[in-house]
Amino acid sequence: MAAMEANIFCTFDHKLSIADVGKLTKLVAAVVPIPQRLHLIKHYQLGLHQFVDHTRGYVRLRGLLRNMTLTLMRRVEGNQILLHVPTHGLLYTVLNTGPVTWEKGDALCVLPPLFHGPLARENLLTLGQWELVLPWIVPMPLALEINQRLLIMGLFSLDRSYEEVKAAVQQLQTITFRDATFTIPDPVIDQHLLIDMKTACLSMSMVANLASELTMTYVRKLALEDSSMLLVKCQELLMRLDRERSVGEPRTPARPQHVSPDDEIARLSALFVMLRQLDDLIREQVVFTVCDVSPDNKSATCIFKG
């Protein structure tokens, strides 16, 4: 793709004040998502403002962000901004717009900002009814933890009153990562979170069905080769579960004689597909890898991986 096509110009309908230009200049090198890749866009297409709805769930906003085009703010020119669509494998200076510090080697992901707690997003720029809302750029472990807790809270809230859920998940809503503490919003059970919960339940049911019989066979064999305490304890646990299921029922052999090698391999393959599906629910795409962090930790030199 030609270099010129990687540049996007954003114009403002009203003349920017000196203060507004100053605010935007401080955001040079920030990651700015846009809905689609066009050569010329308007300011209201910048960031997440057009999709923010405080009556709807965080999972919805996260899904929309995943489908947006990521750009880097290059410079402010009069009444317009120059954005650049990064190229895979190239080095870029990236501004840290998230709540936590970065470290060399971090795999960074984009997440919508949390709108609750002591580290809720700051006001970057407001023009009339429009406000610039930028994503958080956070290390992968933090993104996984946020997404996992959102899913756990959603599943836990099924068939429970708001009061029960609020009391039980309070400890899940506060996350501390690298000395930064912030709050996950209450789960909103909308169609977006429902899809994730349905996928999780289907995958977990398949894992529970496929894993038990296969795991018992393999753990028993491994325990003969390696008498480590973990394997022994694992075998004891599986045998106890097997006995509990088998009370009053005919004894089932560890590996049913009618299961062919092809069938066993098919079951194993299906099991790992389900495990990957569970992982996909909480994993974010890595967009940058940190090569070097600035002394003030406000930016870093990164390789674009998106």
Swiss-Prot record:
Keywords: Capsid protein, Host nucleus, Virion. InterPro entries: Herpes_capsid_2 (IPR002690). One of its GO terms (molecular function) is structural molecule activity. GO terms for cellular component: host cell nucleus; viral capsid. Pfam families: Herpes_V23. The keyword Acetylation does not apply. It comes from the Viruses. The keyword Chaperone does not apply. It is found in: Virion; Host nucleus. Belongs to the herpesviridae TRX2 protein family. Structural component of the T=16 icosahedral capsid. The capsid is composed of pentamers and hexamers of major capsid protein/MCP, which are linked together by heterotrimers called triplexes. These triplexes are formed by a single molecule of triplex protein 1/TRX1 and two copies of triplex protein 2/TRX2. Additionally, TRX1 is required for efficient transport of TRX2 to the nucleus, which is the site of capsid assembly. Interacts with TRX1 and major capisd protein/MCP. This is Triplex capsid protein 2.
